[in-house]
Amino acid sequence: ESMVPMSEIFQPEPLVASLRPLASAAPLSAAELAYRQFYGFVPREAVESRLGWFEVDGYRIAAQLWQPIAPRATLLLLHGYYDHSGLYRHVIEWALEAGFAVLAVDLPGHGLSSGPRASISDFAEYQAVLRAALQQADALGLPAPWHLCGQSTGGAILIDYLLNDQPL
């Protein structure tokens, strides 16, 4: 039995080219649904779901939103180095079961976001993405309290923000 390389199974370029701004409330496209299916996400009744982007300092940042009808809080999820938000299905499902809205972003150079693969010039670039994600959450009217969850590099971004920035 031979293994088929992942690159032959899922090609992200057409999906990336078709993404719309996160703020647009359009239903998921066929390419977006295929991406979600590839990573094991099952559509949920009574949960609005979006996959889109927002711009930060020349990067087009891919973001995913899941919003139940009456969420009790919001979880902002930041992945680790060489990861992307599609790999965090179990955390996202846990948060949805707990009644949270979830906003998950792909860091620059990761997943569906633009930028050289897994490479930034300065850690401050990640801080700019976090601040922009928080602004997106606010603009989308995601409910407080906001909970932050980061794994590895994502956790370091959150700790740096909490220690050195003015949290919202």
PLM regions and their residue ranges:
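An N-terminal hydrophobic leader/cap segment in hydrolases
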Residues: 3-55, 61-67
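Short coil/turn segments at beta-strand junctions that form active-site/ligand-binding loops
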Residues: 72-73, 99-100, 144-145
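Short beta-strand element of the alpha/beta-hydrolase
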Residues: 72-80
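Short, conserved structural micro-motifs that define repeat-unit consensus positions
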Residues: 79-86, 151-155
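Catalytic nucleophile-loop/oxyanion-hole region of alpha/beta-hydrolase
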Residues: 81-87, 111-141
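Conserved alpha/beta-hydrolase
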Residues: 92-115
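Alpha/beta-hydrolase fold nucleophile elbow
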Residues: 141-152
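Short glycine-enriched nucleophile-adjacent loop
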Residues: 155-166
